[in-house]
């Protein structure tokens, strides 16, 4: 009996000891976890684009067509030509109504930033609209064929994408114009209009970038398009604006993170 009681006591002491030791270990582990995820880890994972002070604490694929950082260009066509975003929806901002519903649509996730940017532009007195949003592969094919017929292939290629190579197909890009289509509608002079100047200077505050700048035609392989804006989210948009780099130029850099 005595021996049994002693044994029991020893077991109880051992169990209590184990529980206490586990508790101490657990809190020590939690403490070190916290230390690892706060400032040090953040600093290590943040992306800094050279020439910008912005710390980008998010990261997205540059290849996945559903990613807000995807690069779709002549060099990097969509892997799946039939790609169509799952969350396409008709935008609520002013848009060119004589276009098919598809083209009046963008991805749902762009909507809050788009409405905020248009509201700010309207407040400045600029009556603007979305002239073109999402374009399916077939739609782009139709446009490219008609431009080729009108201007010849070489000229058409400077301003119109081959189907599968247009970022309009991601539902993250849009063309912006004055509602008055006589005012530099999808023309280079739009960049010199008050709305064009304002958009170039403020789009990044809403997560958009001027995708084909005048001084980067050799990099983007597209002519200067002061009307074409692309959603990438605020941190990257601000970093690109500050640094002067295009999305194409930072692609390899973003992929390292
Ligand atoms: Zn465009």
Regions found by a protein language model. Give the residues of each.
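Extracytoplasmic cell-surface/polysaccharide-interacting catalytic and binding patches
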Residues: 2-132, 137-257
